[in-house]
Curated annotation (Swiss-Prot):
Binds 1 phosphopantetheine covalently. One of its GO terms (biological process) is fatty acid biosynthetic process. This is Non-reducing polyketide synthase nscA. The gene is nscA. Residues 396-829 form the Ketosynthase family 3 (KS3) domain. Non-reducing polyketide synthase; part of the gene cluster that mediates the biosynthesis of neosartoricin B, a prenylated anthracenone that probably exhibits T-cell antiproliferative activity, suggestive of a physiological role as an immunosuppressive agent. The non-reducing polyketide synthase nscA probably synthesizes and cyclizes the decaketide backbone. The hydrolase nscB then mediates the product release through hydrolysis followed by spontaneous decarboxylation. The prenyltransferase nscD catalyzes the addition of the dimethylallyl group to the aromatic C5. Coiled coil: none annotated. Residues 1677-1688 have a biased composition (Low complexity). It comes from Trichophyton equinum (strain ATCC MYA-4606 / CBS 127.97).
Amino acid sequence: MDNSMMDSTLRRILFFSNEFPSDDLKDLFRRLDQHSKDRRFRLLSIFLEESTAILKDEVSKLPRPLKELVPPFNSVLSLVDVDFRQGPLGAAMESSMLTILELGLFIGHYESEDTEWDLVPGQSVLAGLSIGILAAAAVALSSSLADVAKTGAEAVRVSFRLGVYVADISTKLEAPQSDGTLSSWAHVVTEMTEASVQDELKQFNTGTHSPELTKVFVSAADKTSVSVSGPPSRIKAAFQHSPVLRYSKSLPLPVYDGLCHASHLYTRSDIDSIINSSESVILPDRSVRLALLSSQTGKPFVAKTASDLFLEIGTELLTGTIYLDNVTAGIVQHLQPQSKETSSCQIDSFRTSLVLRGIHSAVEAELSRDRQLTRRDLVSWISRDFGPRRPRSQASSKLAIVGMACRLPGGANDLDLFWKLLEEGRDTLTTVPPDRFDLNTHYDPTGKTENATQTPYGNFIDRPGFFDAGFFNMSPREAEQTDPMQRLALVTAYEALEMAGVVPGRTPSTHPSRIGTFYGQASDDWRELNASQNISTYAVPGGERSFGNGRINYFFKFSGPSFNLDTACSSGLAAVQAACSALWAGEVDTAIAGGLNVITDPDNYCGLGNAHFLSKTGQCKVWDKDADGYCRADGIGSVVIKRLEDAEADNDNILAVVLGASTNHSAEAISITHPHAGAQKANYRQVLNQAGVNPIDVSYIELHGTGTQAGDAVESESVSDIFAPVTPRRRPDQRLYLGAVKSNIGHGEAAAGIASLLKALLVYQKNLIPMHIGIKSEINPTIPKDLERRNVGLAMQNTPWPRPAGKKRLAVVNSFGAHGGNTTLLLEDAPERVKIQGTEDRITHSILLSAKSKTSLQANMESLLSYLDQHPETSLADLAYTTSSRRMHHNMRFGTLVSSISGLQKMLRSQLDNPNFASEIRPVPNEAPSVILAFTGQGAYYHGMGSELFAEFPYFRAQVQQLDRLAQRLGFPSVVPPWRRFWSLLGVSISAVIGHSLGEYAALAVAGVISAADAIYLVGRRAQLVEERCAQASHSMLSVRASEDAIQEMLAVELETASITYEVSCCNTNQDTVIGGPKGEINDIRRALEAKSIKCTILDVPYAFHTAQMNPILDDLETLAKAVPFKAPSIPVISPLLATVIYDVKSLDANYLRRATRETVDFAAAIEAAQDMGLVDSKTIWIDVGPHPICAGLVRSMIPSASAIPSCRRNEDSIATISKGLVTLYLAGLTPSWVEFFKPREREYSLLYLPKYRWNETDYWIPYIGTWTLDKAHLKHGTKPKTPFSGSMSRPSALRTSLVHQITAETVEATTATLHTISDMQHPDFLEAIHGHTMNKCGVATSSIWSDMAFTVGEYLYRRLVPNTKDVHMNLTDVEVLHAQVASKTKGSVQPLVLRAHLDLSTNSMSLAWFNADGETGECAAESFATATIRFEDPEAWRKDWARLAHLVRGRIEVLEQRATEGKASRLSKPLAYALFKNVVDYADRYRGMDSVVLDELEAMAEVTLVPERYGTWHTPPHWIDSVSHLAGLVMNGSDASNTRDYFFVTPGCDSFRLLKKLEPGARYRSYVRMFPLPEDPNMHSGDVYILQGEEIVGMVGMIRFRRVPRLLMDRFFSPPTTTSVAVPVPPLTGATMKCKDITQTAPALPTPAPPIVVSSPVVSSTMACNIPEPAPLLATSSKSSTPKESPIVTPAESERAEPVDNSMTSQCLRLMARETGLEVEALTADASFVQLGVDSLMSLVLSEKFRAELGVEIKSSLFLECPTIGEMTAWIEEYC
């Protein structure tokens, strides 16, 4: 308001009292603080911030004893709770707070009225008493309200300094009471004059010889009363001394902090020390603007500057006496009429008081009767409702929770199930499920078993391992290794975002760069237990906590902050608080927060139990007298939070509003794990102060409530003291309800806080507080006894919690950490939303559903149908809005346009009832198809086209109006609607343009060749030229349903006779031509063609365009066009004139437009050219831009499979037309901007809570196997008693592996070396290797064990003689195993064996012999049980030999594959192959390397993958050797060609075993073998096992032999030894055994029972057992050659030949990728992207290394980025590999 407009007749007094208003001070300050956060109270906020800063500054300068009295504060509101009338700083706090309150109310009053400064010098005068006069001074120095915000802060500084100084001086006069009792320094005496009181005081002071400084004096006086001041004891003595005063009417005043108005006490130096030490940079040069009346004289202070004014005021406050009568007189004098115009008087004040009422009465009595005196209260505004708060800054915003999701115990996998659980009062307690750990072994209630849990109870979520890996672009292997907490964090984050309707990038607040994640997690069970059993590539990204949040950010492409927090049990709610802080700090605009806990590790159970956290009796018994600890629980929860104003702007549903959030620490607790009531109460106060909320207004608290004695007692105390204090007491209608979700679902630890928050949010939604079920017997006696009197208590039954009309409910959520952290959240109701009722006139609505798998899409459709069946009243408009604009869309899509809910239900049912529906679903392409705009030419326009769009879409309307204004300024009447810009607004990216005839101008404008204004100008002038130069109706145009050549042929006779002439105007399609010419001749042509049954149509146009009729306008048109600038097209232009695609400006000029006007529009040739140049294909989408889809029909005629979309259609609602087009684009793979489509009327739509996404889940769970968490406790105990044998094993050894334990003798000479070693088969590593191969339920040493020992010793001795050897290549030959070595089952026994070796470099060979030894004495047996020879050879010779055989072996493999395809051979899966093996031998998992087998009688091949783990220290791990070689054993013991019912086959050895290169962990190989009976022994079979890597033979087991043994001998030969002594060996039946003392002697060995066996230099496989002596008639002598024999490769007959299997490099690569990712090869389709398959950067590195190592293909990991799909990768491989 301008000053000139103010009421010049109003006389005003502003009175600043020295008393606080009678209102609740805390409430006044809270409301001030609340209003200061609203942008409407900007200056109030500035004033409070400046005042806070000044008080902080002043406190920092105090002496330490005083400084320590002031608690830390961030707002003056924090000081309100301090009892500032007590202590040394009472005067300072009271003075400064009164100044702040009065000036804050003053500023707020003006801002609330939104009025300008109206205090005019001369008309407005200020008055005040005592400290109030300092607040008045701030106004006196101001010329605007903004000035008051700054000068007021300085007044606060002076007030504080004055109070500190006065208190300091006064305590030197009389010390405070030691018991803290407050004594008054002033009394008021009534019905006595000042003079009489002075006389009495003079007598007292003189008579008692009081020092001058401590005398009692008069500090204030008026007609009716006198104030007497002095030290409290002296005042008391004065009243006792004087009979007059003793019997006078007197009262103590609330002045407890010292003396003011004492001229005998203070001097100018005192005043200077207060005023002149002020460090203000604002006030010194400021002038006094308004008169301020002295409280002593009643006249205005004479000061002209700020410094002088404060000096005068300071002098008066410290030394002057207050005379209220003078103040009244001064006020009357000001209010008396100064002129005839003055008609009204006003006193502004802060409520009223006894003094003010006296002044008011006196003024009224003195004023003339024609003066009207009014009062204005400057406090009343503070209680007004100003509507929704408009935050002044992000820091003052309220926050909105807009989405939530959960996985909680008791099957609560969604919010509805969670609420049902709560409403029914269910307890989810159960015992630990077997998939977590085995209670039979890990539970011991006595506590005697180390590392065992003493409680079997918990609360667990359902199916924790189930996860949709494909949806989140994770491979099965990565998913399995990823912590279920992290997986479910992803899932619940998606579901919460879905509920919130968040589409990243839809609005500014949901831009991916402004979204952050905050999750609490306090354990690492999966990483430490389950995944650690087999650490793999994804151990770190799958298990480390930081990756949980990081994976969410990475998947959704959020680039905001990602925090994983651990605050123990409060982690979940602390993460929410951190998210809130980030929102208030402006670091994010949307936050996803939650808590995570999935229990698997018994160690944590044990640790928590031993620390007495856990209940041994069951569930959390919150507030029960028998509470004995908490019960553990799983839990996953996520919430989505925004600032309230953003949520409202985004049209979100708001679940509840966060007013405040805070976390502190119980630093003063008696122990780190003990709760502390003081810290909890301080945190409550912080949250309440932050929000400006009265704790009495809180009506529901969700307790932390663990059910521990200490926790329940402390929390009940803190809650009741703050929220239900003894005084002020809650009214009967202010019941405070309490609840604790842990009594239902247990303590979710890191997820506990988020579970509590989710419950609170549901309480808001359901308006019901669920029953508390934690008290099983009676309430805990440690709970305060007076809770009911305080009107607070648990909701023991389901209790309605209705929202009061026009008000909001307040709730608090607590979560405390065992480490001492306390987190509290304060919530209120969401704003009541009034949905704008629009006129819903859209005829049809687009309903969209999508998924990432066919299964999920079908399930989503079923869910929607079920929802609609249950909610038939659903608004179709809201459903369309929700499914399109408020959903993230995926590659499997369903879309339709419907006009009713019933129609949609019918559509969904018809689709779901189609048995082929799922198979017909196709994902949209990874690359969206190109979109081409086709602009229609003349003849299609009609009245009202696009009118619905014009009416509804502001952008469309604005563009039309802009173009229309351009056209009018150019002198033309109308324009084509701005379709291109509108389609772009809807998110459609244009790839190219084409224009038909006149449409070329629009196409050129869209391509940026000419401007829109130039296009309008040229089209308009062209039309004018046509009208001016061409005769109307003299010519016509004829559309002919035939090609140009066909027309010419049919009209050949007429043309030859020259009876007719025509020109081709347009070649629209190959069968659609438009001709033009003179009207009569065109009519003749029409008749001639119709006579030949050719369809013809005369076009409704007045001219024959693109014919000679246009010649008169061409020169002028070209001249006009030359004035127009032509630019290079921004997108390709498909030219119907040139029948080509134009990419540059060379062909586009004025002449082009001339030719386009005259020459043929060859639309068909242009389309064909675009196809030839690759710009157009069958997937290209065409958008017809024009009033009616003419070009669309032409395109479909040329490309029948093309999608052509109209922008407008005659006689059809234009919004419906656009909707259809958008759905078509959506289903083709584009993602239209549904946001823009719904934006004009978004407020009319509501986001629906539809069923959540239906996941296509698979169980990725790694069970904890065994008892190793228990076993590790025994590592600290002593070892077993030593035997002589075990003692020798404990000595240091130069050679020690898993199988070779100790060197007992070693001799090394120039060319020979001898070595004796000893090993214990009962050693854990050795025993585990033996038990990997069991026969007859006994662990039997496979020959792969002897192979590894041989290679280990061989390489060791060879390097002793030839130390600089790079690689040692060994051929293990003449392996003979005479006796099976069966592991003893006697616990604690030793089972020694001795290996003796002798190497001779002259023969390049080494002989080996294995002996049993006595377990007690270590004495070696007389004869060996196995022998072998190692020959050190050149591997290149092997390579050459095998190269000649490789093609034959590969050929046989291909034949087997083909026969399997034809059903002539058996293809066995891994499970089936090893099931067949169980006829004889049962392999452990690590030995099961064969992935698949093709078996054809005695011939077989196998695909083999070695496990990546070595599981010990080996030369070549036995389980690898067996995996590549035991195919031979499967042939003999699993083929139909063998009599496996009566016999089993074991291998006594082989002629040779050698490997070209070492076997590699995780590598893939192929094995091939063909066994054949030996002619000399019908009970023996032999064959060669070839080992291939890729196309190359890399190893061979030569002449491996198998002997047939009757099954009835199984028990005889494969039973464990009963003692540790060596049994008497069976005498050899053939050859001789090696004597123990003659280790250089070699001898052949007898066959040994065991399925296939192989020996290996770097690797061996197969089942090598021991020789079984058979009955004499069955035995035959076998002589062995020193060189291995290779069995011949048998070439099949032609009839047996088959087509080779696909073993190309591409196929090998695909198989490798499938193996490494855990996917099926069939899933690796050409259009599958590596991102979708879960091939991330880490997997890329693994795959590139595997390609190199296994296939010899050098591929950089970056290739997976350069070739993002399988198809592109395979194309690269075929090209370059």
